């Protein structure tokens, strides 16, 4: 199991948090995703044999947010 902290711009409310967490949790191999709105970060626990960080970034960007 691996952990990645992603910096995400544009998240400001509960809907943003829900959208990003849901998008990540729907990826096979992601076991948990936790958005911290105060610091604009997402902590993701995942199985690196099933999912790549680039897939997680794409899922976040598909929701309209920028991964920096």
UniProtKB/Swiss-Prot annotation:
Query: So which residues are the signal peptide here?
Result: none
Annotated positions binding Cu cation: 13, 16
| Listed SUPFAM superfamilies | HMA, heavy metal-associated domain
| Residue ranges constituting the HMA domain according to the UniProt record | 2-68
- Kindly summarize what the UniProt induction comment says about this protein's expression: Induced by copper and, to some extent, by ferric and lead ions.
Q: Name one Pfam family in it.
A: HMA
The record's subcellular locations are:
Cytoplasm
User: Which controlled-vocabulary keywords does the entry list?
Assistant: Chaperone, Copper, Cytoplasm, Metal-binding
Q: Which GO terms describe its molecular function?
A: copper ion binding
Q: Which InterPro entries match?
A: CopZ (IPR049740), Heavy-metal-associated_CS (IPR017969), HMA_Cu_ion-bd (IPR006122), HMA_dom (IPR006121), HMA_dom_sf (IPR036163), MerP/CopZ (IPR001802)
Q: Which Gene3D superfamilies match?
A: 3.30.70.100
GO CC term, one of those recorded: cytoplasm
Job of this protein? Chaperone that serves for the intracellular sequestration and transport of Cu(+). Delivers Cu(+) to the copper-exporting P-type ATPase A (CopA).
Entry protein name: Copper chaperone CopZ
